[in-house]
A protein has these predicted regions:
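Extended beta-strand/beta-hairpin segments
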Residues: 2-64, 71-149
Length: 149
């Protein structure tokens, strides 16, 4: 059975999130909640976005979505190639500059028995290209893939 589930299976679903904001951009505060309630009134403010305030921000949420989507897509591709990862860990770093997300860097570390470094890097590059969140984003996306023994 082919397992490119995230890109080839004819699926349609929706997910929802809500944002609420009160006040001005600088002084106001808001919350973000997700349908799954994983985020349930998570705090959002100028300080959480542009300084070190307690809470979350859109760029952090993009990084979380991208790292999760990419890592899951990679797992499907590895499985399709006959490999099962012992561990895949991806850190997404979102760069915000002059009002725009200018770069997202994916730093992948993976432990996958019996795969060559070349095959691992090739599969990771394919996952980066076909991950639905990668396709959604209109920015430069770079990748460092490290196979750990």
């Amino acid at each position: 059975m082919q397992l490119l589930i995230l890109t080839t299976t004819k699926m349609k679903f929706t997910r929802k999130a809500n944002a609420n904001w009160k006040g001005t951009g600088m002084e106001g505060t808001g919350t973000i909640s997700t349908q799954s309630t994983t985020l349930n009134n998570a705090q959002l403010s100028f300080k959480t976005r542009f300084a070190d305030g307690v809470g979350t921000n859109p760029e952090e949420l993009v990084a979380a979505a991208h790292s999760g989507c990419f890592t899951m897509q990679l797992s499907f591709l590895l499985n399709e190639g006959g490999f099962t990862a012992d561990d895949l860990s991806t850190e997404a770093t979102v760069t915000f500059e002059d009002g725009t997300i200018t770069l997202i860097h994916l730093d992948l570390k993976g432990k996958v028995p019996s795969i060559s470094a070349e095959e691992f890097e090739k599969t990771a590059a394919k996952a980066k290209e076909i991950c639905p969140i990668s396709k959604l984003l209109n920015t430069t996306i770079t990748l460092t893939a490290t196979l750990v023994s």
